[in-house]
């Protein structure tokens, strides 16, 4: 199964969600940076979801926006 990134923005909460899969109850949460929350697979420890709090403020003040994670992006084929 392909793991595609989806991006959602909650204007009211000012949160950017980056998802590999839907959020589920068994995931572990960890703050990996200044108000950046990672939701981890409980078995593998891999990041499955990110929540970037106060996104519009960050985007306006910090460019480029950097996340404290390694990324291996590939085209879905």
Predicted regions and their residues:
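A residue-level detector for well-ordered beta-strand positions
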Residues: 7, 38-39
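Short, acidic, Ser/Thr-enriched surface-loop or helix-capping motifs
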Residues: 10-11, 41-42
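Short, aliphatic-rich beta-strand segments
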Residues: 15-20
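Short, surface-exposed beta-strand-loop junctions and turns on beta-sheet-rich folds
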Residues: 23-26, 54-56
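Short, small/polar residue-rich loop motifs at catalytic or cofactor-binding pockets
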Residues: 32-35
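C-terminal structural segments of small proteins and small subunits
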Residues: 54-77
């Amino acid at each position: 199964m392909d793991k595609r990134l989806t991006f959602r923005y909650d204007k009211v909460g000012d949160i950017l969600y980056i998802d590999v899969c839907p959020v589920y109850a068994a995931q572990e949460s960890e703050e990996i940076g200044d108000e950046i929350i990672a939701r981890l697979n409980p078995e593998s420890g891999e990041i499955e979801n990110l929540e970037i709090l106060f996104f519009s403020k960050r985007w306006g003040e910090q460019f480029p926006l950097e996340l404290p994670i390694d990324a291996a992006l590939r085209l879905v084929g």
